């Protein structure tokens, strides 16, 4: 399974692609928009870059970091807007989307939902067997998100399928009685 992960941000948007079968890095980067442009132009720039990554890497799933409340309203608005265009790009490309919170990502990668950025970065480097930690932190965060989905997301999917199967089985048993 190929996972494209997006750590949304208006000025810097981290992106990373990993292959789950080998837990290997395919690509990592940061999408940027100029703060000198109007908001709609910045979003359009990021949208085009996200679609470029989708077309280039052909992911099976797109993981987007769930926006959480931040003290700076301008920052959270830009982050939420980029998350929204990420979801739209995935939907229009007919690619499944999953969302994970920052604490879910930290817990999946380090075992601690309150881990510090440097702890997450070191684990990303180890898990993906990288020579160095990707820079800037937005790129590392995207890779951590991709790892989280591989480890946590696929488990959640198996659990959901098993639950649905059991509900169907129980329903059939009830209808026979």
Map each language-model feature to its residues.
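Phosphate- and other anionic-substrate recognition elements at nucleic-acid/protein interfaces
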Residues: 1-177
């Amino acid at each position: 399974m190929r996972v494209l992960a997006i750590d949304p941000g208006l000025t810097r948007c981290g992106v990373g692609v990993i292959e789950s079968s080998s837990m290997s890095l395919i690509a990592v980067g940061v999408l940027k928009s100029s703060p000198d442009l109007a908001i709609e132009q910045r979003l359009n720039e990021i949208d085009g870059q996200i679609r470029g990554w989708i077309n280039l890497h052909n992911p099976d799933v797109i993981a987007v970091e769930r926006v959480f409340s931040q003290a700076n309203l301008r920052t959270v608005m830009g982050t939420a807007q980029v998350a929204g265009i990420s979801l739209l790009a995935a939907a229009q490309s007919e690619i499944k989307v999953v969302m994970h919170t920052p604490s879910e990502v930290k817990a999946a990668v380090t075992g601690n939902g309150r881990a510090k950025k440097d702890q997450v970065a070191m684990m990303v480097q180890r898990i993906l067997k990288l020579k160095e930690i990707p820079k800037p932190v937005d790129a590392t965060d995207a890779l951590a998100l991709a790892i989280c989905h591989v480890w946590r997301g696929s488990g959640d999917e198996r659990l959901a399928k098993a639950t649905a199967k059991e509900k169907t089985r129980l329903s059939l048993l009830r209808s026979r009685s």
